[in-house]
Amino acid sequence: GYTLADGLEYIRTGIAAGLNIDAFAPRLSFFWGMGKNYFMEVAKMRAGRVLWAKIIKEFGPKLDKSMALRTHCQTSGWSLTAQDPFNNVGRTCMEAMAAALGHTQSLHTNALDEAIALPTDFSARIARNTQLYIQDETRVCKVVDPWGGSYYVEALTDELIKRAWGHIQEVEKLGGMAKAIETGLPKMRIEEAAARRQARIDSGRENIVGLNYMQLEHEDAIDILEVDNTAVREAQIARLNKLRANRDNEKVQQCLDAITKSVETGEGNLLELAVEAARARASLGEISMAVEKVCGRHKAVIRSISGVYSKESSDTAAIERVRKMTDEFEKREGRRPRIMV
């Protein structure tokens, strides 16, 4: 729901700038993360297409393709485990299959070791080949909406449409996604969902093979990609210094000043000015700072959640023990315990 509400915000902004809906709606695309709840993920993509068409119809498009939802998908990084990581091959495969059957236009498959480090050539090859054999060997991409007509998938799609539309309406009541973000509501809702999920895992209500279920007694270390962060940082600094030494810095400053002036006055095409600055070899950081001089940098509103984890967890005795220990610590030390996360 929030992703589509983002899209709605872009649509309104484009129209307010004088663009015709058919001139830019077909060029919008979305990015979905694919989880391991297979049928849910297929239904999610089907529901997204229905809702996006419903949203765009309100703006009176003349072209059917304006109502088509184009999407890139990436398998979940959240579902990957550092423990017994070869299980991640199966997880990623199922998530990729859900994306394919949900008709993604493009796909990124995560490598098995990405919960630990950047992928090696070995793990990256397995990740790449996973989507290649789904595409080329299974032929599932040759069928349009293969789950259409399934009672379960259709019912799940309908349920997701209703629930996601409720989230969109909640955002609309706040004045749109930009204003909703300022209130911190979407962030809070996402954190609530994450806390509920973590509680189910920690309490054993949700099994994660190799993590809280069917763990290995002894786990052999796997080869991972070692990166010297200090060397990378020094190399990047050297590249920037070389760039600044060989460019026309007067031209760069003129471009950056033009960006700042555009933000101040609201006149001119900011994207065009940023492209011009990049052509003059201004860095991304310099371009961002030229904007930040006027409008500052966004700081998320922090709205803490409470009671979500304990309500979802079945291990209430353990939670009560922690509360008791915390109270005893406070009496003894005069303060609540601090936890570094």
Q: Which residues does each PLM region occupy?
A:
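Short acidic/histidine-rich active-site segments
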Residues: H103-E114, V140-W147
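Short coil/turn connectors at secondary-structure junctions
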Residues: A25-R27, K65-L69, H103-Q105, G266, ...
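Append "with occasional cross-activation on large, charged helical scaffolds in nucleic-acid assemblies
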Residues: L80-A82, Q105, A178, L185
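Glycine-rich phosphate/diphosphate-binding loops that line cofactor/substrate pockets in enzymes
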Residues: D22-F24, Q253, S262-E267, V322-R338
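Flexible, glycine-rich loop/tail regions that form catalytic "lids" or insertion modules at the edges
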Residues: Q131-L132, D136-R323
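Helix-rich catalytic cores of soluble enzyme domains
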Residues: G1-A98, A111-R128
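Short, hydrophobic beta-strand segments
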Residues: L28-K36, A155, N241, I339-V341
